[in-house]
């Protein structure tokens, strides 16, 4: 019974971490407008970031993937 309780608590905190903390941490919104994610390739590339999503008609980049660092290595 104790093991089941600890497992449920661990799953609960994992769900919070994955669905609440990570998405808000991972996105940088640019000033570029978009209708699809394809329109965000160039604005995100200018900031040395790969495309992430088109959210609310604004390009949103993913800051952990840095194109410039990968090209320099």
UniProtKB/Swiss-Prot annotation:
PTM description: Contains 4 disulfide bonds.
UniProt KW keywords: Disulfide bond, Secreted, Signal
Record localization: Secreted
Pfam family of the protein (one): Toxin_2
One GO location term (cellular component): extracellular region
Expression by tissue: Expressed by the venom gland.
InterPro entries: Scorpion_toxin-like_sf, Scorpion_toxinS_K_inh
Position of the signal peptide: 1-26
Protein family: Belongs to the short scorpion toxin superfamily. Potassium channel inhibitor family. Alpha-KTx 27 subfamily.
Domain remarks in the Swiss-Prot or TrEMBL record: Has the structural arrangement of an alpha-helix connected to antiparallel beta-sheets by disulfide bonds (CS-alpha/beta).
Name of the featured protein: Potassium channel toxin alpha-KTx 27.4
Species, as recorded: Mesobuthus gibbosus (Mediterranean checkered scorpion)
Lineage, broadest ranks: Eukaryota, Metazoa, Ecdysozoa, Arthropoda, Chelicerata
């Amino acid at each position: 019974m104790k093991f089941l309780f600890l497992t449920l608590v661990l799953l609960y905190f994992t769900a919070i971490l994955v669905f609440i903390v990570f998405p808000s941490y991972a996105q940088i919104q640019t000033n570029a407008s978009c209708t699809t994610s394809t329109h965000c390739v160039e604005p995100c590339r200018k900031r040395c970031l790969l495309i992430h999503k088109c959210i609310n008609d604004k390009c949103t980049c993913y800051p952990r993937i840095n194109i410039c660092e990968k090209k320099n290595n």
